[in-house]
From Swiss-Prot:
Localization annotation: Periplasm
BP GO annotations: transmembrane transport
Database matches in Pfam families: SBP_bac_8
Subunit structure: The complex is composed of two ATP-binding proteins (UgpC), two transmembrane proteins (UgpA and UgpE) and a solute-binding protein (UgpB).
Transmembrane segments: none
Species this protein is from: Salmonella choleraesuis (strain SC-B67)
NCBIfam families in the cross-refs: PRK10974.1
Disulfide bonds: none
Name this protein carries in UniProt: sn-glycerol-3-phosphate-binding periplasmic protein UgpB
SUPFAM superfamilies in alphabetical order: Periplasmic binding protein-like II
Record family assignment: Belongs to the bacterial solute-binding protein 1 family.
4Fe-4S found in the keyword field: no
Its job: Part of the ABC transporter complex UgpBAEC involved in sn-glycerol-3-phosphate (G3P) import. Binds G3P.
Amino acid sequence: MISLRHTALGLALSLAFTGQALAVTTIPFWHSMEGELGKEVDSLAQRFNQANPDYKIVPVYKGNYEQNLSAGIAAFRTGNAPAILQVYEVGTATMMASKAIKPVYEVFKDAGINFDESQFVPTVAGYYTDAKSGHLLSQPFNSSTPVLYYNKDAFKKAGLDPEQLPKTWQELADYTAKLRAAGMKCGYASGWQGWIQLENFSAWNGLPFASKNNGFDGTDAVLEFNKPEQVKHIALLEEMNKKGDFSYVGRKDESTEKFYNGDCAMTTASSGSLANIRQYAKFNYGVGMMPYDADIKGAPQNAIIGGASLWVMQGKDKETYTGVAKFLDFLAKPENAAEWHQKTGYLPITTAAYELTREQGYYDKNPGADIATRQMLNKPPLPFTKGLRLGNMPQIRTIVDEELESVWTGKKTPQQALDTAVDRGNQLLRRFEKASKS
């Protein structure tokens, strides 16, 4: 009898523990962070899981931003969407117009978590805020601005002051010629050419990218990046390209690897590229602001963000949404947001994270680490330098890439390429406008 009782008790305990294990709510989180950035995402998830044993955040790398967005939407249509989907900033209008999301402010409200939306830096939060309700639709996560990375050792070899980086595009052209003359195979390369050379070039120099305040004021916006200032800028890059001073190495972040491998002396890339540069560069490097056009009065203005936010997908149960809310709240805590900023180079997305980082002396110990924030806050944004909210923007970026490539290969002039990009892009905007009204 005693043996049977012990067996029954053991079985009951076993079932109880099994039940507890099964009670863990698994929360898939699809993202596009690879390399050192992916390791930081995994670290955040592990720390949350340890502190919240009832939930398990499962980060899954699903490819680059475009691939992740496509995979997420496709999965939603088949009923297999993740709970959390990281979407890059130009996918915002697409996500807003979809029926695939549950706004984050509703997620927090339903979970009974008092979440202060005002904690986010306004210029970041504004990108993901619903104009009608004034609430966040997605949560800012890895926001960035383009910055200029430069090889201080290469500068010294070329007889350039390693503490004096080029401030204007005209100066950058002069620097690249000297760097090439000193033996560098590549004087300058750029990542994310559409985002940096047109979207941010326009904002940084106080120019609209599209009408209707870059789409924030309506879906009937038209593209306007084929004006004389933008054409002149692309023409300058093309002249550098012909001389071999500017190297086109790819549409995404390929220039970062070319930089930290020592092939290119300078690159404009995401501030979020700092994590990989810090890990792999074997030389002294510096970080500076994006160049501006010396001939444009009032420049520089302010940078607009890139990177991505976290969207919550529809169709999940209450317990999953509660876990999602707790995880998003965890990410926004000052100590976690500050650590993410410091380890990756992405912007501090909350005011508290910025203040904590400053109080810790991080900016004093790491000169240049605050460049991305300073660019974003350089001047109060104009109505058309707050960012972009244009439908089908991922596809428009692809068009821009194709047309700029036609310039670098000598098939089109800068004016022809930008005119064509605007015409093709406007066709996509009209399709989005029509679909959004149906």
